[in-house]
Swiss-Prot record:
Coiled coil: none annotated. GO terms for biological process: rRNA 5'-end processing. Pfam families: RuvX. It comes from Edwardsiella ictaluri (strain 93-146). It is an enzyme of class 3 (hydrolase). Gene3D superfamilies: YqgF/RNase H-like domain. HAMAP family: Nuclease_YqgF. This is Putative pre-16S rRNA nuclease. CDD domains: YqgF.
Amino acid sequence: MNPRTILAFDFGTRSIGCAIGQELTGSARPLQSFKANDGVPDWQQIEKVLREWQPDLVVVGLPLNMDGSEQPLTQQARKFANRLHGRFGVQIALQDERLSTVEARAHLFAGGGYRALEKGRVDAASAALILESWFENQYR
C-alpha cells in the first residue's frame, strides 16, 4: 500500500484553513488560509493548492455542537465538501472538528503569545489538528 497524501480544510464563512499530511507518518502541518465570502472561497486558489499537492484524499472538518448535533455551519461545510468533489473530482472525507480551533489557539498562544493568534494561522493550525484527528480515527 502506498502512503497517501491528504489535504484538510477547516471550513469557515470568512476564512478556510488548509493543511497537508502524510498517511505514512500520521502527521499534518498547516499550509495557509483562504479568505471566503460567506463560505465561498476563491476557487482558483483552492484549485492551485490541489494541483500543487495532488492529494489522494481531502478531509473537511465538520463543525458540530458539543453534544454532536448539527448547527447551521455544518450544512455549509457539507456543501463546501460537495463542491470540492464536484469541481475537482477529489475523494472527500468528513471529520468532526469540535474544539479544533480552541486547541489551535492554545497551541499557537503557547508558542508565541497574542501575536501568534493571527486568524489565518489559527485556521491553518485548526486544519492540521482536524487532519491529525482523522489519522487517529483511521488507526485505532
